[in-house]
Amino acid sequence: MHEYRTHDCGALRAADAGITARLSGWVNVKRDHGGLLFIDLRDHYGITQCVFPAGSPVFAAAEALRAESVITVTGRVVKRDADTVNPRLPTGEIELVAETVEVQSTADVLPIQVAGEAQFPEELRLRYRFLDLRREKLHRNIMLRANVIAWLRREMTARGFTEFTTPILTASSPEGARDFLVPSRVHPGQFYALPQAPQQFKQLLMVAGFDRYFQIAPCFRDEASRADRAPGEFYQLDFEMSFVTQEDVFATIEPVLGGLFREFGGGRGVTQWPFPRIAYDEALLKYGSDKPDLRNPLLITDVTEAFRDSGFGLFAKIVAGGGVVRAIPAPGTGGNPRSFFDKLNDWARSEGAGGLGYIIFAPDGAKGPIAKNLEPARAEAIREATGASVGDAVFFAAGKPLEAAKFAGTVRTKLGTDLGLIDGAKFEFCWIVDFPMYERDEETGQIVFSHNPFSMPQGGLEALNGQDPLTIKAFQYDIVCNGVELSSGAIRNHRPDIMLRAFEIAGYGAEEVEARFGGMLNAFRYGAPPHGGSAPGVDRMVMLLADEPNLREVIAFPLNQQGQDLLMGAPAPVPAARLKELSLAIALPPAPKKG
């Protein structure tokens, strides 16, 4: 018999009754029923109930065990009585009557309980992550992540992609976030950067003649934490393809993503591919976001003209100043009590808005603060434009075009959630396309890249030379699921002349471009294929599949929201001798003044 186990703790069934088995695992729960002591023994695979009869040689040893001690139990498998069968466990028809028990490792008093559903502060969970990972839900999430990654590897390989690894120590690049820098000991005063993405390397692989690349790529960005963004590092399904159009990229990855969510989505509905394509401008207009949640049926309507020169002075003034007014319908809320509308007004103020105006379409006409000062014909035009019916209400967002669009999107999400309109049993995918190539920096007034600087502009060099930069669209796209951006991607700018001109418009001289991107730019001078790709976030996909509120619930050892590893104690000071070896000196910011 094996020293530690003949079976795992999830393997034994009624058909095994009568055999002698040996199990090893952790003491999950211990229950004393007078003449019998029960221990639920847990390992990676499941739980088996072990029975220790009073008076037996093993009873005293079992009685002294603390939860989470590691033991090996040898005994006879017996069927449970019908009234003691546990249908919640795959092993629930049997139990192991212990004959010997060996303690492999004892556990101290636990700082957090592993068994049960008790909640603990996240700081405590992260400090004792090795215990937290034993808990059923988190353990299941991490296994889901592992299975998702294995599935993605198989799918990409089956579709002709080759897995490559790209450098972790590389040069800094403007990916939109701060780099993590690594000082060079051999080259004092110079630094490597951890890659924000394998962007340049995967493009260089296409230039090198490899047709289809992928990897489960680690990416490093020194940016603040959000529910859907982990500080420090994250992983993405990074892929690139040669000789492809935008539609080729979509057609290749849609069945991978759709198939993944069908495989691991627990029976929830998944958008049938091809996924909808929504232009960026249309997304901002209809959904108030470039990552719309299509499970929400509410659509935003532009009603600017209904308020131009109208009797409602506040909105008329905004429109006269170049602003816009967007309307968000709220079906069936016209009869709601005043408190419903007051609470939404309070919420809007908490979001930084002045309030949330509305019109109620009652059987005897339009009602509410706005309707009192708005001509009836204009109110009726709003009702028709929004598709509202009698008994509905319509809410409004007004201001500068982008501000009004985004706040209308926030209102749409709030109403969809509060009114129970969002179907939690679906995964709704879409592509956002036709992103602007450039935007104006509000602080400096300069033209800057709006997203990825390596995207091919629609219209190529002719567009760069002949169009207002703010009107140029890029062959750039995002894949969105349930309001979560899974990835950005693009057809790449593979021509040096187009790239240099694109960077020139954004304020980069040729010398600076050569200095920062000379490796890739030089490679393009020796024959580069048209190519494109994307990089769906693994962490975000698993978060959606596991129905978790934040990424830390699907990462084995995440940093906390302040970018700290509480378990390993990172970041941490380093000895002065090490700093000297690296030719570094620390200049700390001044301590904040007290009082």
Curated annotation (Swiss-Prot):
ATP binds at R221, D222, E223, E485, G537, V538, D539, R540. Gene3D superfamilies: Bira Bifunctional Protein, Domain 2 (3.30.930.10), GAD-like domain (3.30.1360.30), Nucleic acid-binding proteins (2.40.50.140). InterPro entries: Aa-tRNA-synt_II, aa-tRNA-synth_II, aa-tRNA-synth_II/BPL/LPL, Asp-tRNA-ligase_1, Asp-tRNA-ligase_1_N, Asp/Asn-tRNA-synth_IIb, AspRS_core, GAD-like_sf. Its EC number is 6.1.1.23. Residues 199-202 are annotated as: Aspartate. The record marks H33 as: Important for tRNA non-discrimination. GO terms for molecular function: aspartate-tRNA ligase activity; aspartate-tRNA(Asn) ligase activity; ATP binding; nucleic acid binding. L-aspartate binds at E175, R221, H451, R492. It catalyses: tRNA(Asx) + L-aspartate + ATP = L-aspartyl-tRNA(Asx) + AMP + diphosphate. It is found in: Cytoplasm. One of its GO terms (biological process) is aspartyl-tRNA aminoacylation. Disulfide bonds: none annotated. Its main location: cytoplasm. Keywords: Aminoacyl-tRNA synthetase, ATP-binding, Cytoplasm, Ligase, Nucleotide-binding, Protein biosynthesis. CDD domains: AspRS_core, EcAspRS_like_N. One of its GO terms (cellular component) is cytoplasm. HAMAP family: Asp_tRNA_synth_type1 (MF_00044). PANTHER family: ASPARTATE--TRNA LIGASE, MITOCHONDRIAL, ASPARTYL/LYSYL-TRNA SYNTHETASE. Homodimer. Belongs to the class-II aminoacyl-tRNA synthetase family. Type 1 subfamily. This is Aspartate--tRNA(Asp/Asn) ligase.
